[in-house]
Regions:
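Small/aliphatic-rich secondary-structure junction motif
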Residues: 6, 10-74, 181-235, 308
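Structural beta-alpha unit
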Residues: 1-21, 34, 41, 93-128, ...
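A short acidic, glycine-rich active-site loop
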Residues: 74-89, 232-240
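Short, hinge-like loop/turn segments at secondary-structure boundaries
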Residues: 70-74, 122, 147, 175-184, ...
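Extended, non-globular alpha-helical segments
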Residues: 2-17, 151-181, 236-237
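General small-molecule cofactor/ligand-binding pocket signal
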Residues: 54-56, 104-108, 159, 220-222, ...
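Glycine-rich, Arg-bearing micro-motifs that act as flexible, cationic patches
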Residues: 127-153, 164-168, 283-308, 318
Length: 318
């Protein structure tokens, strides 16, 4: 249920400088169709911003032990050598398919997040791109918790490409791997920024605003009230939500379009996803707090948004 919605379609606000331009993008893959679906988006970002793409595959002890069935150490070492050779070959094909995009490939062994965090720190990674599925977890990017670790602890923004994102077709990079996906182009025409209006909003909202400015995109700011049983008697939270959303956009933001302010009542994930679908949004922006492992929105909400969104979801540390 939409409680309040303010929108103006005139594109006459003056544009000013202010850009987001990641220099180093990390794309994590386990070579499943789930993770491979994010590669076209990582490549599109690199083409747009002139970024270097860091392609990472981690051979985890857990996955290798499952493959060996608990056999002796010699067999484990042979399997590891074979797995590393296979992974190196796949990464070489990915690299060759990236054409003129500057790229580096990594095969690591051990705990996934430990290896990723090291690569992130050593290479000043500005953005992480992952593919996810919508069942019980965040994809086969290793056995259950890896994508969650990334979203909770990444020191930089994370772009998640969920199972309902359009354009998950075939791409030349993966010819011969059974999952060829076609290129996509980075075109942001409408961005939806969802917030629960905590203090973190003041550090995350500028990212959505900067992207809207840079791409001359429409921007919708949405706040969802999940506990709305008393709103007819005391509508204060609605009015407060509108004022706080409006305050997130500086008066001198100089966007191409006047931002749309929306306050809705209902399940947060449903309202956010439906708002993005209604506007044919190209990106949803959410906040995350890596320091204490909690999300700006509840993690279950973030998960459901990623699982059901028809566009990529950008989570930003706050």
């Amino acid at each position: 249920m939409t409680v309040l919605e303010f929108k103006q379609d005139t594109p006459e606000i003056k544009r000013r400088s202010g850009r987001i331009s990641p220099r180093n993008i990390l794309y994590a893959t386990d070579f499943s169709a789930t993770s491979e679906s994010a590669l076209p988006h990582a490549a599109a970002l690199c083409r747009r911003f002139g970024s270097t793409l860091h392609v990472v595959h981690v051979l985890s002890d857990t996955s290798l032990l499952l493959m060996t069935g608990g056999v002796d150490q010699v067999s484990f070492e042979v399997l590891y050598d074979d797995a590393q050779t296979l992974a190196t070959g796949k990464l070489k094909r990915v690299s060759d398919g990236l054409g003129k995009i500057p790229n580096r490939s990594y095969v690591r062994h051990g705990k996934v997040w430990t290896n990723l965090s090291t690569i992130i720190a050593e290479n000043d990674i500005d953005l992480i791109v992952i593919g996810t599925h919508g069942r019980t977890g965040f994809g086969k990017l290793l056995l259950g918790s890896v994508a969650e670790d990334i979203l909770r602890h990444a020191p930089c923004p994370v772009l998640s490409v969920g199972p309902k994102v359009c354009g998950r077709t075939k791409l030349q990079e993966f010819v011969g791997t059974g999952s060829e996906l076609s290129p996509v182009e980075l075109e942001l025409r409408h961005i939806v920024y969802a917030t629960n209006l905590t203090a973190a909003s003041q550090t995350v909202a500028p990212v959505a605003i900067a992207l809207a400015k840079q791409f001359e995109a429409r921007l919708t700011l949405i706040h969802v009230i999940e506990n709305y049983s008393q709103l007819e008697i005391a509508p204060g939270p609605i009015e407060s939500g509108v004022r706080q959303l409006q305050a997130l956009v500086p008066k001198d933001a100089a966007l191409a379009y006047v931002p749309e302010i929306v306050v809705e009542c209902g399940p947060a994930s449903d309202c956010i996803v439906n708002a993005a679908i209604k506007r044919d949004a190209d990106l949803i922006v959410l906040g995350a707090r890596p320091a204490d492992g909690t999300t700006h929105l509840p993690f279950s909400t973030v998960h459901r948004v990623v699982a059901h969104a028809t566009c990529p979801v950008l989570t930003v540390p706050a």
